[in-house]
């Protein structure tokens, strides 16, 4: 008996499908792993027990800790990535990714030990992804932590061509007796501000709106570089200078100035009943923030609750240690100013005020 012929468009007549046909290129993923191994290798430090490629990354807590407490943090780069796509600049966002997490765990006194990344896209461009991961590795070197693993997710239909998203995960350790939680801060303590390298990684939805309104030439000279370079400057990593400072004197509190600016981040390390009074004249407003404020018509109060306004990290020390801390940080290459003091809060007052 003759078998019925398959219809022209039936599954039986269709050519067999592959994962590549579905939009996932396994070979590209393998090529990326090979491309990034040298970058990751440069970040190796004591404690790493294996290389990239295993199911899990192994790390041994350094023996110098008697009672180690692990401190973890995770973050992304936010809509700064949209500007990176527009400018086709992918060499700085990797450092941004590392900085956002390692600076966060640093404020509790933690030494960053290792970092993992997540790179998600619709179609994997090996060159772009390798550039991003190279920046991640460079950020890890600046922070003294190992890039010990990550995930590259190619998900067709999830992201437009040429776009991707990033997430980072940092783990550090601090001696239990040396955890910094702000509990020792008292009235009279001094608030030191460490300079930011630019906008860092927060406020970019407003930045992009201002650019949309102002329509500037992003390739034009701006304070010794192009406006595009100023806008994409990577987030500063404060780890090594501040870890060194903690070895020299008592740091009572720190605040990484991210989303919410000075007025929302400093209160996170202050006990109830304390207020940090900041003097806006104590440090210069960098030209980039002045440009954003002018072209966006942004009010002073809004600037202080959206942007870092030139201060990327706050350190609180006793008045007796303020000069020494300033000198040590300056010697380590940081720009630092005494930007305020801690005092008792007035009734109904916010925990950080800018005067």
Swiss-Prot record:
One of its GO terms (cellular component) is cytosol. It catalyses: 2-formamido-N(1)-(5-O-phospho-beta-D-ribosyl)acetamidine + ATP = 5-amino-1-(5-phospho-beta-D-ribosyl)imidazole + ADP + phosphate + H(+). One of its GO terms (molecular function) is phosphoribosylamine-glycine ligase activity. It is found in: Cytoplasm. Keywords: ATP-binding, Cytoplasm, Ligase, Nucleotide-binding, Purine biosynthesis. InterPro entries: PurM-like_C_dom, PurM-like_C_sf, PurM-like_N, PurM-like_N_sf, PurM_cligase. Pathway: Purine metabolism; IMP biosynthesis via de novo pathway; 5-amino-1-(5-phospho-D-ribosyl)imidazole from N(2)-formyl-N(1)-(5-phospho-D-ribosyl)glycinamide: step 2/2. It holds the Pfam family AIRS. Its EC number is 6.3.3.1. It is an enzyme of class 6 (ligase). Belongs to the AIR synthase family. This is Phosphoribosylformylglycinamidine cyclo-ligase. It comes from Paraburkholderia phymatum (strain DSM 17167 / CIP 108236 / LMG 21445 / STM815).
